[in-house]
């Protein structure tokens, strides 16, 4: 049984679960947001630059998606991406 898509957050998860990922765009309070499907995070030890790790949506997608959704990147920093997407209807986001 498919989950009913009621909010933009529901649509985000629907897009994220699709094997062919796209960037997700939405507008909110005068800002355009782009959540990149090809985002990467690199880490390494600061003292010796060893033990480099690469995290990308292909292998660590759920973990990175949750970090993105929990970030506060709007100008007033009063809402997380998750909170914003929860307020918007599904048709407010588009793929690119």
Predicted feature locations:
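Negatively charged, low-complexity tracts enriched in Asp/Glu with abundant Ser/Thr
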Residues: 1-27
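Mixed-charge, Lys/Arg-enriched low-complexity segments
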Residues: 56-96
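Amphipathic, interaction-prone secondary-structure segments
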Residues: 18-49
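Extended hydrophobic/Leu-rich segments
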Residues: 8-12, 16, 35, 64-68, ...
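Residue-identity detector for threonine
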Residues: 7, 43-46, 76, 80
């Amino acid at each position: 049984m498919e989950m009913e898509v009621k909010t933009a957050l529901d649509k985000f998860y629907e897009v994220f679960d699709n094997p062919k990922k796209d960037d997700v765009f939405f507008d909110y309070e005068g800002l355009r947001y782009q959540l990149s499907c090809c985002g990467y995070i690199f880490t390494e030890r600061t003292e010796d630059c060893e033990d480099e790790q690469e995290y990308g949506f292909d292998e660590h997608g759920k973990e990175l998606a949750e970090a993105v959704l929990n970030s506060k990147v709007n100008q007033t920093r009063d809402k997380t991406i998750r909170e914003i997407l929860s307020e918007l209807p599904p048709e407010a986001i588009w793929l690119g």
